[in-house]
Regions:
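Active-site bordering "gate/hinge" segments
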Residues: 1-306, 321-322, 347, 403, ...
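Dual-mode signal for accessory low-complexity, basic/Gly-rich regions
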Residues: 110, 266-464
Length: 464
């Protein structure tokens, strides 16, 4: 190994060699991205980026316990490693004992591709997609609508090495496509999004046709007041709600009485029935089409993550099984405090157990209700009930006698995803979906459409 190498696996090895701490974890994330943007039926920009982020976690043993220090920097080269290591060690020496301290993980076999070059994306990922998008521009132009949006593809190669002997590597592709169609006067708008690993399974023509149909629905405008309505939540909206629920499902917080998963009188609600529908909410690092890291990658400690757990193998986990709460997210530390199993968070989320009905079939079986496009600007109101507020966007449609009667105004909603699971009367066919609100952080989801008989539209919103 040379002192000036920039190969990721050699960078992490050199970083470990420089460490003087009692323990050390090094995470190198090699990023590459390719993107396209368009407006008014024409491409506007495209680009490719490359980058590296190096995270050093130093652990220092003391009389009162083990402290940790974490420092991350981007664009790090071999010549800058020592200062980064010393900064992490200084942070550890200046910190008190880490509450989540545990021995570093051992015994995980080395990844066979650990010494390989990082995976990279490029504009070639759009070779088939870009011409198909151009054809959609032409159809939209001829149909009197304008398309706006972007496509982004990212590949992150993560190299994780520790002083305890772990040498792990994971390549994570992540693609998102968001498409807006607008009427020329900007009074009507519709949205569709897709999550993809490689842009080979997205169809711009089908998305444009879907948006054209929705703009047609919006030609008839109907004003509705705030209130509770039977509502069909599409998979993207279900994903946005349940992802936030997953982020709020830390075992320790629940055991200490701070969340919706806290049991009155103490303990957690694990074992309680949350839904009368036979729904199963689960994560699996090996789920086809939604694959994610099969081991813990923790750049910092928090409610649902511990830097001491880096490299811990991940397994398929059922958070809710058949409507019953089975697990909360638990690190080794929080599992020890609560007596619950070690169940770290995993980078995908799947809800299944519904019927085989499509959203269109559920619409056809609706006497009167609302059909949403997506949710937006979701914020927490009350952690004790997980009450969330947010807005509908880009199309809310009134369904009467199995058909869309027209577009209604947007609303602000106030709902708890946990309560919604309990009140849901139907779930349809599970499909891959892109959560619109959380797509910058979480894209690997598969959800069904869900029918709620009394969704709370708390006030009218004037947005398009």
């Amino acid at each position: 190994m040379t002192a000036r190498t920039d190969k990721p696996h050699e960078i992490v090895e050199r970083t470990l060699e420089l460490s003087r701490a009692d323990g050390c974890v090094v995470i190198a994330d090699e990023h590459s991205t390719a993107n396209l943007r368009w407006a008014g039926n024409a491409l506007t920009t495209n680009g490719v980026t490359r980058g590296r982020t190096l995270t050093v976690i130093a652990t220092v043993d003391g009389k009162e316990g083990t402290a940790s220090g974490v420092v991350s920097r981007s664009a790090v080269t071999a010549g800058e490693l020592e200062s980064l290591v010393r900064a992490a060690e200084a942070a550890a020496h200046g910190a008190g004992p880490a509450e989540d301290a545990n021995p570093l993980v051992t015994g995980v076999p080395e990844s066979p591709d650990f010494t390989d070059a990082p995976a990279e994306t490029s504009s070639a990922v759009f070779t088939d997609f870009a011409p198909a998008l151009g054809e959609s521009f032409a159809r939209a132009r001829a149909g009197g609508r304008e398309l706006y949006g972007f496509a982004n593809h990212e590949l992150v190669s993560t190299y994780l090495a520790t002083s305890a002997g772990l040498r792990l590597r994971h390549d994570q592709p992540n693609g998102t496509l968001e498409l807006n169609a607008k009427s020329p006067d900007r009074t009507r708008s519709a949205w569709a999004g897709r999550s993809t690993r490689d842009f080979k399974d997205v169809d711009p023509a089908a998305m444009d046709a879907e948006l054209a149909r929705r703009l047609g629905w919006a030609e008839r405008r109907i004003e509705l007041p705030a209130g509770r309505y039977e509502t069909l939540l599409p998979p993207t909206a279900v994903a946005d709600l349940l992802i936030y629920q997953m982020w709020s499902a830390a075992a320790r917080d629940a055991a200490e009485g701070r969340t919706v998963f806290s049991r009155t009188g103490g303990g957690t609600r694990v074992g309680e029935r949350l839904s009368e529908l036979p729904l199963t909410l689960r994560s699996d690092p090996h789920e086809p089409g939604l694959e994610t890291a099969p081991f813990v990658v923790a750049h910092a400690s928090g409610d649902d993550a511990s830097v001491f757990d880096n490299g811990l193998p991940l397994e398929a986990t059922e958070w809710i099984r058949g409507g019953e709460l089975k697990h909360l997210t638990a690190t080794r530390h929080s599992a020890g405090l609560t007596g619950l199993p070690v169940t770290p968070s995993i980078g995908n989320l799947i809800l299944d157990g519904g019927s085989d009905r499509s959203l269109e079939e559920m619409v056809a079986n609706t006497e009167r209700g609302l059909l949403l496009t997506c949710l937006w600007y979701i914020r927490e109101v009350d952690p004790a009930t997980l009450l969330l507020t947010g807005l509908t966007r880009d199309g809310v449609y009134l369904v009467e006698n199995g058909e869309v009667a027209g577009e209604v105004n947007n609303f602000r909603f106030n709902e708890s995803p946990v309560d919604l699971l309990g009140r849901a009367t139907e779930a349809g066919r599970t499909e891959k979906t892109l959560p619109r609100e959380w797509s910058d952080w979480f894209t690997r989801a598969a959800m069904p459409p869900v029918r709620v008989p009394d969704f709370n539209m708390s006030s009218v919103s004037q947005g398009v």
